From Swiss-Prot:
It comes from Mus musculus (Mouse). Keywords: Cell cycle, Cell division, Chromosome, Cytoplasm, DNA-binding, Guanine-nucleotide releasing factor, Methylation, Mitosis, Nucleus, Phosphoprotein, Repeat. The lineage of its organism: Eukaryota, Metazoa, Chordata, Craniata, Vertebrata. N-terminal methylation by METTL11A/NTM1 is required for binding double-stranded DNA and stable chromatin association. Dimethylation produces a permanent positive charge on the amino group, which facilitates electrostatic binding to the phosphate groups on DNA, while inhibiting histone-binding. Methylated tail helps retain RCC1 on chromosomes during nucleotide exchange on Ran. The modification N-methylproline is found at residue 2. This is Regulator of chromosome condensation. Residues 1-36 are annotated as: Disordered.
Amino acid sequence: MPPKRIAKRRSPPEDAIPKSKKVKVSHRSHNTEPGLVLTLGQGDVGQLGLGESVLERKKPALVPLLQDVVQAEAGGMHTVCLSQSGQVYSFGCNDEGALGRDTSVEGSEMVPGKVELQEKVVQVSAGDSHTAALTEDGRVFLWGSFRDNNGVIGLLEPMKKSMVPVQVQLDAPVVKVASGNDHLVMLTNDGDLYTLGCGEQGQLGRVPELFANRGGRQGLGRLLVPRCVLLKSRGTRGRVRFQDAFCGAYFTFAISREGHVYGFGLSNYHQLGTPGTGSCFIPQNLTSFKNSTKSWVGFSGGQHHTVCMDSEGKAYSLGRAEYGRLGLGEGAEEKSIPTLISRLPVVSSVACGASVGYAVSKDGRVFAWGMGTNYQLGTGQDEDAWSPVEMTGKQLENRVVLTVSSGGQHTVLLVKDQAQS
C-alpha cells in the first residue's frame, strides 16, 4: 500500500501536463512546400552557409547539406532553415547565441548545423541576434539575445543570453512568430498578440515611452516577460483580436480579424504609414491602409521602409526612399502612404532587407531593388536599383522561386526545380 500512496502524490513532470490539451496549430503563414536554399550577398561571418572560403556571392549560390527545406529566414547576420520534417538548421554569426548550437569547432558556424530540439517545428523567425521556433503544438522556443541602443538586454531574463533553445512560458498556443531586429511577436490561436524584447522605439506596442528604456523602474522584466498587447475594441466591451502580424526592424504591423491594419514602433520616415514621424508606443489604427476595395495580406519592413501587398497581388511601398529601397523609380521621395510599385507583375509575397526590397511573382520569379552595396540584389553589380530588377543567375535557371528573406547584408531564396512545380 505505501508505494501506491507515494505514486498518488507524485505530480506529473511539467512537460507532460499540457499533453491532454495539445492541439496542432496552423496558420496561413506556415510554408509546407519544400525546396533548395540559395544565398547571396556578404558572408564574412558565415551567413551564406557556403563554408570558410566563400565570404561573398554576387549571384545566388546553392547551400549544400540542405534538402527539403520549407522555410529559409535571414536574420541580421545569420540564417535559419526549417526542414520538411520539422528540424531546424542554422549558420552565421553566433556571438550572442543566435545559432542555438555549439560552434566551438572552428568554421562550424560557416556551414549549416542542426539545432537540437526534440519537438517538430512548423515555423521559424530570425532577428539581429535571436531566433525563434514554433512547434506543431503551439509552443515557442527562443535562443540568442535581444539588444537595445546600449547593448545586450537579455533574452527571457535580464542580461542573460541563451546559446541553446529555451521555452517561452505562455498559456495559449501560438500560431505564428515574427521577429524584428530585437523584438519578437507571437500570435495566439485566440487572436492575441504577445511581444517581448527591446521596446525603445515602441515596437512592443504595450510599453509606454516613459518605461521604454530598459523597462523603467520595473526593470528589464517589463520587456523580456511576454505580455499581451491590449487594445479595446470600439463599440464593444471586448478587445481587438488579430489574424496576422509582421515585423520591420523596429516596428510591428498587425491585422485585426475585421481586416483593419494596426501599427506600432518607429515611424521616423512614415514607414508605418502614420501622418507624423513620431514613434508609436501603442497600436495605431492606420487610416492610410483603409481602402474598401483592398484587403492587405502581407507586410515586410526594413530599417526605415515597408513593402506590403494586397489580396490582388499588387505590391506597394512606403517610408524612406534613399538608395531606391521603395522601388518607385529614379528620384522617388519618401512616402507616407502605401504607393503602388507599378513595374511588377502579380506577386505572391514581398520581403525587405535593411535597405532593399523584394517581390516574388506568382509565376516564381524574384525581383529586387534598393541598395546594391552588399550584392543583395543579384545583379552582379554594387549599384543601387531604383526600380525592380529581375534576379538572374545559373542557380535560378529552370527553377521557380518560392520565397525570399533578407537580412542586413545577405539574402536567402527558397527555390525548386521547374519540373516539380
